[in-house]
Amino acid sequence: MLLPYMETGRIEAGCDEAGRGCLAGAVFAAAVILPEDFKNEDLNDSKQLSEKKRYKLRPVIEREAIAWAVGIVSPEEIDKINILKASFLAMHRAIEQLKVRPEHLLIDGNRFTPYPDIPHTTVVKGDGKYLSIAAASILAKTYRDDYMNELALEYPAYHWLDNKGYPTKVHREAIRTHGITPYHRKTFTLLPEQLTLGF
């Protein structure tokens, strides 16, 4: 059973990212503030939910949340600052768009660059522990999936409809055959010997 809040009586936002381990595309993050009495049996770690269920939950989260927002960091920015910093920047961009200012941040993972004047707590595997992080995970993943599905129409050879930019065998083989696209992260490009060895 996921916990609604770490500490009641304060406005708490859950934050999570999607696309950190991808070879292509932007990294997305979401921040969600849920009411203290929010309940939903279907809401769990978004990685364990089917795609259909995630998309079914997205409008429920958006409708019932006190506030929610999505932040995006482009592949070009990722190459400039590295993927870890890009993940934190995406979260910061989501937080700064919230229409209600949170008093505390619940961050999925074990590290975070502090957001100005808002205390935070990092929670390893937080999307399996707190409702607000699980909700943020669903928003980040579904909005990023929508974005990758759009890019897939432009570059069908990379099968992004299926792999969403993650380093699957099919995706790696497509890079070996066709080279990289403007949406590939240059700092993530696999070396020829890695492609040959099947890493």
Curated annotation (Swiss-Prot):
Q: Which residues bind a divalent metal cation?
A: 16-17, 108
So what does this thing catalyse? Endonucleolytic cleavage to 5'-phosphomonoester
Single Gene Ontology BP annotation: DNA replication, removal of RNA primer
GO CC, alphabetical: cytoplasm; ribonuclease H2 complex
Q: Molecular function terms in GO for this entry?
A: manganese ion binding; RNA binding; RNA-DNA hybrid ribonuclease activity
What residues does the RNase H type-2 domain cover? 10-199
Kindly name one Pfam family recorded for this protein: RNase_HII
Q: List UniProt keywords, sorted A-Z.
A: Cytoplasm, Endonuclease, Hydrolase, Manganese, Metal-binding, Nuclease
Location in the cell reads:
Cytoplasm
Output the InterPro entries linked to this UniProt entry: RNase_HII, RNase_HII/HIII, RNase_HII/HIII_dom, RNaseH-like_sf, RNaseH_sf
- Give yes or no: UniProt keyword Manganese: yes
Q: What class of enzyme is it?
A: hydrolase
Cofactor comment: Manganese or magnesium. Binds 1 divalent metal ion per monomer in the absence of substrate. May bind a second metal ion after substrate binding.
Q: What is its EC number?
A: 3.1.26.4
- Required co-factor? Mn(2+); Mg(2+)
Q: What does it do?
A: Endonuclease that specifically degrades the RNA of RNA-DNA hybrids.
Give the family per the record: Belongs to the RNase HII family.
Provide the protein name.
Answer: Ribonuclease HII
Q: Which organism is it from?
A: Parabacteroides distasonis (strain ATCC 8503 / DSM 20701 / CIP 104284 / JCM 5825 / NCTC 11152)
